[in-house]
Amino acid sequence: MSETGTSFRDLKLNEIKALIEGGEYDVVDVREGWEHVGGHIPGARNVVLSRILANPQGVQFNERTIFVCEVGERSAVASEMAVALGVKDVVNFRGGHKAWREAGLPLEKGS
């Protein structure tokens, strides 16, 4: 991440898993509500990408946030928005829920 805070880190499964296990990052699932309810990374909160795009200042993110979607594309857009809003440590989960599921890692169901 640059000193000016104009970029985010794009990390894959093993690095993301370590960050989540460390407990210092907020995990934000930007998928649609029906996708989130069907299964999500334990502890992830759902903030749909369209909500972020419609009202960026209306959504609060922690200083250390991991964004996740199905494969890492929608979450990259959310990551760009978070950087623009001044979030200091932004991480995009490249591979997303698809990689998490395929690795057999636990998922929570419901909201």
Regions from the PLM with identified roles:
Residues 68:
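Short, surface-exposed ligand- or partner-binding patches at beta-edge/loop junctions that are enriched
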Residues 1-26, 33-65, 73-111:
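Rhodanese-like catalytic fold shared by cysteine-dependent sulfurtransferases
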